[in-house]
């Protein structure tokens, strides 16, 4: 694919996003009420626009970034607005990444506040969790610090850790320059490995399930989009691996400092390259799950591009076909949209920010 075709698509996407930026710098959805406050979409759009090299686009990204410190207070707290943060971990993690990319005292101070907010939502001993708990070390969708429920009580399902939120939390720590020996990384590995269809001991691997891929969450079949894969030879119910979560898992492993040549990283990378598809979200999806499979197509593209680039996978295997497919799917005017509605990629701001972010990585990896 000619470079100018990708550049034209990226410029068109940036222009479309800029046309939908509010005067205060934020992006707000016209599709979903949960995205109308600005906190959910703004850090995602800012990170996408920061990949551009156009001065006007970078200026708009800075205006969007200026919206984020307004929620950070000098005492280290976050004031999210009248309705709270819809997606606290994603907002905080993407805010940290954007503010650290911009740098400078103003942005760094706000990034530190957002990072503190993020760390308060990791499941740690301070919140009653211990390494004997399978949830220990992960991040979920809790609106407040996710304290361990008292005996006999049930945890809020939204607070339970998942692989996507955990990957974002870990990458924010890296973006903020936290060293690899920071205990947050070790705690997170405890959770990440539990979502990996992989056995450290080759003798204990079940080839029907231990394929090197990842799943989203522990013990929750409906939220694992590929569903239950079956029962292994030890009698355990196993979840099927699928694309977006395997990309998330690979990002998490690398953020935790595992080497590219390590066994877990290699297994996850091989799963992605062996099953890679630019046209569809790959994985062993069970019957009746085609809508869920399609619902995170643009997130799959975004996470896979980040994961494969970070892992050093050969660009020819994925970057060129992914770029071609994304350019083909772009709508007149510069946006993208997913027909599947289950995870709100039918909101064009969501889909466009994800697609353009993936396309930028493809562009930087290809040699013309």
Locations of regions flagged by a protein language model:
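Active-site-surrounding "flap" and adjacent substrate/cofactor-binding loops of secreted or lumenal enzymes
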Residues: 65-71
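Conserved catalytic core of Hanks-type protein kinase domains
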Residues: 20, 71, 329
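An alpha-helical repeat/solenoid feature that recognizes helix-turn-helix modules
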Residues: 1-12, 28-61, 74-116, 120-190, ...
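N-terminal capping segment at the start of a domain
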Residues: 19-26
